[in-house]
A protein has these predicted regions:
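Active-site-adjacent betaalpha module
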Residues: 1-48, 52-90, 95-302
Length: 302
């Protein structure tokens, strides 16, 4: 490559709002690279970056410890494999304040909003401990299905990834590398915007936690079949990365030739504290049951 890693990424500002690197300049540099276009790659490799956004960096609204170092390793991996990666897809968690997992959707008996990380159960609704300010019938229906069908509990998150804010944006240095690749390889970045339904969480990129219409992103699932390798990294390992992988492997559970093409970069993702044990159990199942490859970014050869 003509461009150096440090021309594209400044590791000292990962997770910060300002970007000292001029995007126009690095895209001009990308255009001067001599790579073959993505469509001519004999081996089709997809890099799927899950929610690598400002609000999930350490200083973000829902910061994940270790996220900034994850971004450094992710950008180094993409740089080292620039010509081998055919395409990049990124998920972008996108919300408004008035969603079922944000505080202002709920009040207690005294009219107070729940603190972030409060768990709200069906029993809490029945006892009057918490009640929905907005759409109480659908809110109860969501919690009921979440507990019965998904075996989960609604967690109230800090306001995060609010549409149009800096927290909603891709992390700056990651974005530098992603769009450098896009121009250098003549490959359009696929953006998977998720999380806009006010009545459901959407951790995974394929479907909502609960949806009365039963929508799943078949278009993206069908695209996955065309790749020889699917590389996955991002934040948080315990939630959006885990659920994205789970949704993909469950859809392809009878097709191991697809699931064994998945490579998860274990040094390029971190968990929200408190969820580590259950997360490791889930990833072990991905490996044993679905033949998903769990590797370090420095170990995989493209």
């Amino acid at each position: 490559m003509k461009a150096k890693y440090t021309d594209i990424v400044n590791v000292n500002v990962i997770g910060k709002a300002e970007n000292p690197i001029n995007v126009n300049e690095i895209l001009k540099m990308a255009d001067k690279e001599a790579f073959i276009p993505s469509r001519q790659n004999k081996e089709r490799v997809l890099f799927l970056g899950i929610d690598i956004q400002q609000d999930f960096m350490e200083n973000g609204a829902l910061g994940v410890p270790g996220a900034c170092k994850d971004v450094e390793r992710i950008t180094q991996f993409i740089y080292n494999n620039m010509d081998k990666i055919s395409n990049i897809a990124v998920s972008i968690d996108t919300h408004t304040p008035h969603q079922i997992f944000h505080p202002c959707w709920w009040i207690d008996e005294n009219g107070n909003y729940p603190e972030p990380y409060t768990l709200i159960t069906l029993a809490d609704l029945d006892s009057g401990k918490w009640k929905a300010v907005i759409n109480p019938i659908a809110s109860r229906d969501y919690i009921e299905h979440l507990e019965q069908d998904r075996k989960k509990t609604l967690c109230i998150w800090p306001y995060h990834c609010i549409q149009g804010t800096t927290g909603n944006a891709l992390e700056n240095q990651f974005a530098n590398m992603v769009y450098f690749h896009s121009v250098a390889k003549k490959a359009v970045v696929q953006r998977l915007v998720k999380g806009q339904d006010p009545l459901s969480e959407m951790y995974g990129v394929i479907r909502l936690e609960y949806d009365t219409k039963g929508f799943i992103n078949l278009e993206f699932l069908n695209k996955l079949e065309k790749f020889d390798k699917i590389i996955i990294a991002g934040e948080a390992k315990s939630h959006c990365v885990l659920e994205s992988i789970k949704q993909i492997v469950e859809y392809y559970k009878s097709r191991p030739e697809i699931t064994k093409k998945i490579y998860v970069l274990e040094d390029c993702m971190s968990s929200i504290p408190g969820f580590e044990t259950i997360t490791e159990q889930a990833f072990l199942e991905f490996k044993q049951r679905y033949q998903v490859n769990i590797v370090k970014s420095t170990e995989i050869t493209l």
